[in-house]
Regions:
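Intrinsically disordered, low-complexity acidic/Ser/Thr-rich segments used as protein-protein interaction/activation
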Residues: 83, 103-114, 120-124, 128
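Short, glycine/acidic-rich hinge or "gate" loops at secondary-structure transitions
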Residues: 79, 97-109, 276-281
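Amphipathic alpha-helical scaffolding segments
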Residues: 81-88, 103-104, 110, 245-254
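Secondary-shell segments that build the walls of catalytic and ion/ligand-binding clefts
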Residues: 2-50, 61, 116-284
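Long, hydrophobic/aromatic-enriched structural stretches that serve as scaffold segments
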Residues: 41-100
Length: 284
């Protein structure tokens, strides 16, 4: 067997293994998360202790949906979009909660991460407009719902900002952090705080998504996530090229998703290491 045939045979074996392993690994990972949930509880939506577990639970649903799309719908396009979203989620978790060694840096990133999305939502708020097709009562309810939504977002924003300004890190790096929380920034992807305040948000001090993908250490897949799958996410021209949704092509996507799932479980086990030790000890 020549080298080319050996490589093709190895790829076929990997694809075949993925179809066998994927549902089993997913079922086992859900079991792992269930055990973890029983041990630590769910916490609030912005609790730094339980938030990574919440994200992992959400991703198991996405992994399940991906399996159904590949096996039943054979939708190559949607499969790519879901995998890219999964990669984005895991890359964010990895940067915020694992790559960061210092606890206060981790807390800072966590709060900035939420502030970034909250500020975006607040900036896109649109209040209902009264017209003849809606009653005064219905309009009042819609208006109250929107006001309540804004109120809740503002309360969460104030809590997050308060968390940041009470960090010891805020005392030692006040100017830098003030730049990070300046309206329009909330830069949770900063590389270092030990830099001139005026340069804290410069592109040379910000992790790109491509760099964040590389931190997952999935053997060059950062190019696949950042370039190839971007075509599907954004509906670019090359995403409309016909690719046969056969077992081999879909299997390649499944093997990448399986690698992401394994990476996510490793991350969760590392982040909750002491909790898993308790789980193991309780089973003895």
């Amino acid at each position: 067997m020549n080298k080319q045939n050996m490589t093709k045979s190895k790829i076929s074996q990997t694809i075949g293994d993925s179809y066998q392993k994927y549902p089993k690994e997913l079922e086992r990972f859900i079991w792992v998360l269930d055990k973890l949930k029983q041990t630590i509880g769910m916490g609030s939506d912005i609790d730094i202790r339980t938030y990574p577990m919440k994200v992992a639970y959400k991703l198991t649903t996405m992994f399940t949906t991906l399996w159904n799309i590949i096996i039943h719908d054979k939708d190559f396009c949607c499969a790519n979009i879901i995998i890219r979203s999964i990669a984005d989620n895991i890359s964010s978790l990895n940067l915020i909660y694992q790559q960061t060694i210092e606890e206060e840096i981790k807390i800072l990133r966590h709060n900035l991460y939420f502030l970034d999305d909250i500020d975006t939502r607040l900036g896109n708020i649109q209040y209902p407009i009264k017209n003849e097709n809606i009653s005064e009562e219905e309009f009042g309810k819609l208006l109250n719902q929107q006001h309540l939504f804004v109120k809740n977002l503002m309360e969460a924003k104030n809590v997050l900002l308060n968390n940041i300004t009470h960090l010891k890190l805020y005392t030692t790096h006040k100017q830098q952090i003030e730049k990070l929380i300046k309206k329009g920034h909330y830069n949770w992807k900063f590389i270092s705080l030990d830099i001139e305040p005026s340069k804290i948000n410069n592109k040379n001090n910000v992790y790109t998504w491509k760099k964040m993908y590389s931190l997952l250490e999935l053997k060059g897949q950062e190019y696949f996530f950042s370039s190839y799958q971007s075509s599907y996410v954004h509906g670019l021209s090359l995403s409309n090229i016909t690719i046969m949704p056969n077992k081999e092509n879909l299997g390649i996507l499944l093997s990448i998703a399986l690698a992401l799932m394994v990476r996510l479980e490793l991350y969760i086990r590392n982040y909750y290491q002491s909790d898993f030790e308790r789980i193991i000890n309780n089973q003895k």
